[in-house]
């Protein structure tokens, strides 16, 4: 039995990691926010999945969650390994998504603070002299039936209301990765000897457009898709490179979001029929 400490363990990604670790019989601690005992305790293997992205309404909260606590842990914490959960959003409007690619910050990005804090935290990890691994998940999705997340929510709307409102361009495309794939990869990389000091993308490896998602919803629910013409931010994402994670985890086979939407629709219909 290994000791794991999961910061952000009550959040979307963190709770999935905690569930998998507990299911395998590991000793897992999820500290409460502002618990100073984390600096006096042997944390074992740390997975840092805490974070915040509301740059408009809570800029200092974004900094605190993404940087401040992590910096204190790197400087004062007692741990063997640390996995820091960053984001492939740092590749937005770039030509490459290689982990070694040069990165830029876009002045017209209203959430650039998020990218900046992620990059600062990554650099602190690399400069800390500690045993760290940095992972960059793409757009993480879940399929929990009653989740407020984007995909389950629009699936419920398609079935319950026969209508889905889309406030993005039809050709808006990004990489979607299942939360189960992210959690499993984080746990594997946390003990992988060759992942120390590495930055590793966790993604499907291909982009999916909003229209592809809408087409699946329409095909299996016959719902109406309403596209709203709004001024959408300049967000273009290159295809995410996954060669590094495959080299480290040869059996890494990420789920397909379109297939998972189809499964979610079937599950939701079965749930309604049973109730």
Question: What does each model-found stretch correspond to?
Answer:
Residues 2-23:
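N-terminal Rossmann NAD(P)H-binding glycine-rich loop of SDR-like oxidoreductase domains
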Residues 7, 49, 82-88, 135-137:
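SDR active-site strand-loop-helix element
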Residues 35-76, 90:
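NAD(P)H-binding glycine-rich loop region in Rossmannoid oxidoreductase-like domains
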Residues 53, 88-95, 138-141:
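Active-site segment of SDR-like NAD(P)-dependent oxidoreductases
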Residues 63-64, 100-122, 148-152, 175-176, ...:
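Short-chain dehydrogenase/reductase
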Residues 71-113:
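Conserved Rossmann-fold NAD(P)-dependent oxidoreductase catalytic core, especially the SDR/UDP-sugar
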Residues 123-173, 179-181, 217:
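NAD(P)-dependent short-chain dehydrogenase/reductase
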Residues 167-169, 174-275:
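C-terminal substrate-binding subdomain of Rossmann-fold SDR/epimerase-dehydratase oxidoreductases
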């Amino acid at each position: 039995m290994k000791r794991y400490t999961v910061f952000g363990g009550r959040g979307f990604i963190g709770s999935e990691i905690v569930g998998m670790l507990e299911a395998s019989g590991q000793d897992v601690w999820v500290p409460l926010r502002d618990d100073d005992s984390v600096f006096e305790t042997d944390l074992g293997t740390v997975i840092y999945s805490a974070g915040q992205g509301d740059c408009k309404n809570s800029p200092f909260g974004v900094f605190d969650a993404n940087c401040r606590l992590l910096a204190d842990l790197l400087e004062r914490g007692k741990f063997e390994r640390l996995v820091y959960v960053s984001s492939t959003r740092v590749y937005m409007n770039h030509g490459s998504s290689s982990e070694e690619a040069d990165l830029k910050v876009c002045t017209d990005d209203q959430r650039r603070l998020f990218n900046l804090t992620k990059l600062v935290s990554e650099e602190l990890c690399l400069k800390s002299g500690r045993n760290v691994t940095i992972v960059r998940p793409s757009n993480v999705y879940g399929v929990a039936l009653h989740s407020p997340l984007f995909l389950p929510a629009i699936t419920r709307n398609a079935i319950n209301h026969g209508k889905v409102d889309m406030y993005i361009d039809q050709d808006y495309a990004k990489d979607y990765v299942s939360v189960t794939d992210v959690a499993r990869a984080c746990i594997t990389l946390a003990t992988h000897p060759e992942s120390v000091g590495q930055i590793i993308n966790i993604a499907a490896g291909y982009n999916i457009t909003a229209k592809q998602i809408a087409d699946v919803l329409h095909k299996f629910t016959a719902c109406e898709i309403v596209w709203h013409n709004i001024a959408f931010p300049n967000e273009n994402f290159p295809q995410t490179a996954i060669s590094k994670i495959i080299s480290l985890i040869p059996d890494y086979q990420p789920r397909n979001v379109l297939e998972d939407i189809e499964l979610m629709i079937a599950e939701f219909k079965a749930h309604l029929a049973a109730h």
